């Protein structure tokens, strides 16, 4: 019997997170705060993206001890990041029993030409995308869940908005095309034809697509849900704020009740200072994490 997780099971696990918030944590204490706030899963890593950005150098998979401490601290699913194309980091995380692996541009890529063949793993994967071409290539490789790349560690929502709007606009374009136009569109996007055909018929991606990269306030989370996100990843925004526990609960509530503006106003009161943001135009080309991968 194959030890590879089936596509249906992997995608079903991602569907169970729909409508929720997944939070980056670096220790057991933060993981407990996230779970108590209502997070549907946590991402265990050594440093949040803002600290990875500030430190520079090569960012790698977290120490397995951190992953195990987080696993032992919570009952919700635990995710962890592997470098793009790093087969062994992914296998190590699979051996640790994580519930999901993020093949992440937040870490320094191990392979600038090839992403992981995620179909070969039992554990499901989440990957980032900026457009429908990237989205469908990752799905073809076996990704069971997508997220916008945004610009991690900046506290600036503008790139996540751009990526979510672009993917959804391209889905609408494909859905309106005749089948004889799809092959040319597949060529233009660098997208597998069969996946575009499925997207045309269904009018949506075959996997969930969360928002990530720059979510820093309850209003940011609600905005991404209104733009069509299936849920929200929050990296640096929570534990770089003045009051992480209160901030975490507020973002979870805003994600759930994303059209209740009165509630979002109440949730946004007296949260303290949000993380200090970065203007995207001030980043050098080599500092733009979203450019990693293809």
Curated annotation (Swiss-Prot):
Broadest EC class assigned to this enzyme? lyase
Which keywords does this Swiss-Prot/TrEMBL entry list?
Lyase, Pyridoxal phosphate, Schiff base
- Where D-ribose 5-phosphate binds, per the record, is at 24, 153, 214, 235-236
User: Which reaction is recorded as catalysed by this protein?
Assistant: aldehydo-D-ribose 5-phosphate + D-glyceraldehyde 3-phosphate + L-glutamine = pyridoxal 5'-phosphate + L-glutamate + phosphate + 3 H2O + H(+)
What pathway is this protein said to act in by its record? Cofactor biosynthesis; pyridoxal 5'-phosphate biosynthesis
Q: List the disulfide bonds.
A: none
List, alphabetically, the SUPFAM superfamilies matched: Ribulose-phoshate binding barrel
Task: Quote the NCBIfam families the UniProt record gives.
Answer: PRK04180.1 (NF003215), pyridoxal 5'-phosphate synthase lyase subunit PdxS (TIGR00343)
How is the quaternary structure described? In the presence of PdxT, forms a dodecamer of heterodimers.
Q: HAMAP family recorded for this chain?
A: PdxS
Main function: Catalyzes the formation of pyridoxal 5'-phosphate from ribose 5-phosphate (RBP), glyceraldehyde 3-phosphate (G3P) and ammonia. The ammonia is provided by the PdxT subunit. Can also use ribulose 5-phosphate and dihydroxyacetone phosphate as substrates, resulting from enzyme-catalyzed isomerization of RBP and G3P, respectively.
Q: What is its EC number?
A: 4.3.3.6
List the molecular function annotations (GO) for this entry: pyridoxal 5'-phosphate synthase (glutamine hydrolysing) activity
GO biological process terms on file: amino acid metabolic process; pyridoxal phosphate biosynthetic process; pyridoxine biosynthetic process
Q: What is this protein called?
A: Pyridoxal 5'-phosphate synthase subunit PdxS
Regarding protein family, the annotation reads:
Belongs to the PdxS/SNZ family.
């Amino acid at each position: 019997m194959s030890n590879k997780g089936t596509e249906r099971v992997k995608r079903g696990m991602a569907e169970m997170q729909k409508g929720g918030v997944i939070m980056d944590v670096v220790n057991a204490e933060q993981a407990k705060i996230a779970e108590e706030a209502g997070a549907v899963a946590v991402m265990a890593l050594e440093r949040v993206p803002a600290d990875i950005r500030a430190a520079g150098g090569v960012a790698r998979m977290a120490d397995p001890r951190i992953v195990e401490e987080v696993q032992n601290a919570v009952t919700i699913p635990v995710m962890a990041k592997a470098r793009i194309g790093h087969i062994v980091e992914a296998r190590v995380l699979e051996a640790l029993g994580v519930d999901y692996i993020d093949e992440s541009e937040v870490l320094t890529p191990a392979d600038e030409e090839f992403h992981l063949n995620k179909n070969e793993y039992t554990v499901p994967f989440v990957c980032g995308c900026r457009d429908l071409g990237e989205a469908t290539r990752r799905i073809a490789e076996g990704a069971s869940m997508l997220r916008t790349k945004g610009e991690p560690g900046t506290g600036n929502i503008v790139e996540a908005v751009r990526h979510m709007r672009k993917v959804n606009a391209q889905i609408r374009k494909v859905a309106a095309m005749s089948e004889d136009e799809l092959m040319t569109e597949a060529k233009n996007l660098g997208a597998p034809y069969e996946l575009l055909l499925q997207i045309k018929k269904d009018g949506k991606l075959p996997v969930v697509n969360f928002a990530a990269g720059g979510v820093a306030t309850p209003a940011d989370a609600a905005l991404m849900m209104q733009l069509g996100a299936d849920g929200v990843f929050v990296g640096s925004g929570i534990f770089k704020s003045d009051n992480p526990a209160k901030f975490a609960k507020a973002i979870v509530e805003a994600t759930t009740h994303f059209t209740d503006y009165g509630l979002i106003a109440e949730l946004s009161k007296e949260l303290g200072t949000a993380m200090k943001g970065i203007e995207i135009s001030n980043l050098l080309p080599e500092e733009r994490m979203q450019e990693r991968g293809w």
